[in-house]
Amino acid sequence: MTQDPHKMFDEWMDEAKKAETDDPTAMALATASKQAFPCVRMMLLKGHTKDGFVFFTNLGSRKGHELLENPVATLLFHWKKLRRQVRIEGAATLISDEEADAYFATRARKSQLGAWASEQSRPLPARDVFEKRIADIEARYEGKDVPRPPYWTGFRVSPIRMEFWNDREFRLHERELFTLNDGRWQSEFLYP
């Protein structure tokens, strides 16, 4: 029985990248408001190390607000073709400006412009308003690198629980739960 859920996650992700043709790094991100209202949305995983799981967002978005107010999150990866899922719970912290700048520089130019143009999660009166904002920002940065907006950054979810689920016939699923206790991972199997 492995005692390193990060290694197990990497192995499962490698298999998912071979089996899943569309977005094997797609994950459901669950956050909650201060009033405990949950909200779930799909995101893309952009990095994973033993320190945690990284994704990027606009701090003005609902998820940005919720993670700043209530800095915990749950991630769920579901790989249908493999009949597997991984659920991760942990604290969410902002990544460094250097990390955010480095990732932002790798994004497609249109995505960089969109980060400046989007007032994410706020009402949009008409699509052409957004397209005009993109055109204006494109003109502003014509011939120049697009810098990262100060409100666009990443979060790292540092897990304290990681559950690996394998689908089995007749709903006799296999579940292994890893829990971080005093800096060490402990694992146990759970009934389906």
Curated annotation (Swiss-Prot):
Pfam families: PNP_phzG_C (PF10590), PNPOx_N (PF01243). One of its GO terms (biological process) is pyridoxine biosynthetic process. Pathway: Cofactor metabolism; pyridoxal 5'-phosphate salvage; pyridoxal 5'-phosphate from pyridoxamine 5'-phosphate: step 1/1; Cofactor metabolism; pyridoxal 5'-phosphate salvage; pyridoxal 5'-phosphate from pyridoxine 5'-phosphate: step 1/1. It catalyses: pyridoxamine 5'-phosphate + O2 + H2O = pyridoxal 5'-phosphate + H2O2 + NH4(+); pyridoxine 5'-phosphate + O2 = pyridoxal 5'-phosphate + H2O2. Its cofactor is FMN. Keywords: Flavoprotein, FMN, Oxidoreductase, Pyridoxine biosynthesis. Binds 1 FMN per subunit. InterPro entries: Pyridox_Oxase, Pyridox_Oxase_CS, Pyridox_Oxase_N, Pyridoxamine_oxidase_dimer_C, Split_barrel_FMN-bd. Substrate binds at residues 46, 103, 107, 111, 171-173. It comes from the Bacteria. Its EC number is 1.4.3.5. GO terms for molecular function: FMN binding; pyridoxamine phosphate oxidase activity. FMN binds at residues 41-46, 56-57, 62-63, 85, 120-121, 165, 175. Catalyzes the oxidation of either pyridoxine 5'-phosphate (PNP) or pyridoxamine 5'-phosphate (PMP) into pyridoxal 5'-phosphate (PLP). Homodimer. Belongs to the pyridoxamine 5'-phosphate oxidase family. This is Pyridoxine/pyridoxamine 5'-phosphate oxidase. It comes from Zymomonas mobilis subsp. mobilis (strain ATCC 31821 / ZM4 / CP4). The gene is pdxH.
